[in-house]
Amino acid sequence: SQYDNGQLWRVGDQAATDAAFKSAAHVTKIDLINNRLIPNAMETRAAIGYYDTGTEHYTLYTTSQNPHVARLVISAFHGLAPEHKLRVIAPDVGGGFGSKIFIYGEEVTCVWASKRIGGRPIKWTADRSEAFLSDAHGRDHVSHAELAMDASGKIVGLKVHTVAAMGAYLSTFSSCVPTYLYATLLSGQYNIPNIYAEVDAVYTNTAPVDAYRGAGRPEATYL
């Protein structure tokens, strides 16, 4: 990466794409910004954590779009409890759009704290300001693209360099969104024989980004 706070990801045949550009009759260039956005569902995130002192089992009610993954991640990476002693239930999720796939610290804290106070359930609901500040955001790409064409106007090559802001730390699927779910789909419905893409994923002092409404595919379609 050209940035100290980033990682570079590449896909495509750079040599073949460079050759296509070298022999092209026309080359057009464009710079695009895909703005950062906040999902802002009408129903904010909420969680209830409960620890059963008799069975030593944990139960988490949470507005998660992916309760099975939440159970796996909370068990494997947060070390709260083995999976067979942890239930994650997603009743009324409300609007999600991808932002409720990420495993948030508040959910884990509710079940962790319930054990610390003798098994009393703990409820947490985000207010609107918290949702704006802490929910996983979406998009935030700055891209430079070049398109090569032959004399008849047929596309023979595409080069793309995208700077994707990851936020202060990685969320559940953030590294997949601007790479495999974006750069591999840049051709869209067109037959482009040579494509080379570079993605600079950089850390920024902002909320982390994650999957949002198509997760990389809309960004590719826009470009």
Question: Where do the language-model regions lie?
Answer:
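Structural alpha/beta core scaffold segments of enzyme domains
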Residues: 1-223
